[in-house]
Regions:
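ATP/Mg2+ or Mg2+-diphosphate-binding catalytic cores
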Residues: 5, 158, 164, 272-316
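Short secondary-structure junctions
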Residues: 23-31, 85-88, 180-184
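ATP-binding pocket architecture of kinase catalytic cores
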Residues: 35-143, 160
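A general structural signal marking secondary-structure boundaries and capping sites
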Residues: 87, 128-136, 180, 203, ...
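A cross-family kinase active-site recognition segment
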Residues: 110-171, 178-188, 214-218, 285-289, ...
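Active-site activation/catalytic loop segments of kinase-like enzymes and analogous catalytic loops
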Residues: 221-252, 263-282, 293-297
């Protein structure tokens, strides 16, 4: 049985989906009900109901590796497996090589975290810390500044539309990178994409972090800065977020978190610039709108009246 979506992503990909399902243990591919899952910006995601269970199947889109957006598939898949074993991500049921796909346990009755009330900030801090303090080691390191350079290089090569005043932005971001002075010895396993759809709330109130395409070992304050900017936290909220995470009010760590929001928005601008040149993207995802939002947040970060104080306080 097939449920078609308006953009016919399922219609185009159904043969590959069912071929992959034949390689997932305990799944009857022939009788499976397959639905398109909208909202993903990288791979083709499907919800499968079969043999009394529900799973998520991700058909891998390897084109993103070729332009420096995500790490090679084996790295991302192993990171996803680790996150599931930690208990913060969704458990992986199978890795399929032909077609390249990942089958994950469906997390039932989960909804994206609502940034309302008093408890969502400390709960998000706790979820991030669960990953960071897990003792796991992902299979790659992640530096958003270096990743942005790779993606902008790919974007230039592909004739992408770059932001206005690009060279000036490069110089301003370079000052932030110099101040933050990333050091590999400080790195912990990081999600690196902590925005609404990737932070799910279970019926019991637990938070789960899904989608490890951008994951890697990195500076924990990058995850905090990413969440702070994507959840549009004001300064008071960022202070509460950092205090919940670090169990203290520390102006140095708050400043680092705020400056890592610059890194986040710069890297995502680069990502969306590349994405807008790609042929096999998902029709229901607004890549241009995401680029506009990343640029808006980046300009807000760099025009903050206390940017100089942030740079001073964040220095090692």
């Amino acid at each position: 049985m097939t449920n078609n979506d308006p953009f016919d992503e399922l219609g185009q990909n159904e043969p590959q989906v069912r071929k992959a399902l034949t390689q997932v243990p305990g799944v009857d591919a022939q009788d499976a009900v397959v639905e398109w899952l909208s909202g993903g910006g990288a791979h083709k995601n499907f919800l499968v109901t079969a043999s009394g269970r529900r799973i998520v199947l991700k058909l891998w889109n390897t084109m993103w590796e070729g332009v420096g957006v995500i790490s090679p598939a084996p790295v991302v898949m192993q990171n996803t497996i680790l996150a599931g074993q930690i208990g913060i991500g969704a458990p992986v049921l199978a890795v399929v090589s032909d077609p390249l796909a990942l089958a994950l346990e469906f997390l039932p009755d989960c909804t994206p975290l609502e940034p309302t009330g008093d408890r969502w900030i400390p709960r998000l801090a706790s979820a991030a810390k669960t990953l960071h303090e897990s003792g796991a080691r992902f299979h790659n390191d992640y530096n958003a500044f270096a990743e942005a350079r790779k993606m902008f290089a790919a974007a230039r090569q592909r004739g992408a539309e770059l932001p206005e005043n690009f060279e000036q932005l490069c110089r301003e971001v370079a000052k932030v990178e110099h101040t933050l002075d990333l050091r590999v010895n400080d790195f912990v396993p990081c999600h690196n994409d902590l925005y609404g759809p990737n932070v799910l709330e279970t019926p019991t109130g637990q938070l789960r972090l899904i989608d490890y395409d951008l994951s890697g070992n990195g500076d924990r304050c990058y995850d905090l800065g990413f969440a702070a900017t994507y959840f549009e936290m004001d300064l008071d909220s960022i202070n509460r977020f950092c205090e919940a995470y670090f169990a203290e009010h520390n102006p140095h760590l708050v400043a680092r978190t705020r400056l890592f929001a610059v890194a986040c928005n710069w890297a995502t601008v680069a990502l969306w610039c590349v994405a807008m040149t790609m042929a096999d993207t998902n029709d229901d995802y607004d890549y241009r709108g995401e680029r506009t939002n990343s640029l808006r947040r980046l300009h807000a970060n760099l025009s903050a009246t206390d940017l100089g104080a942030q740079l001073r306080d964040a220095s090692r």
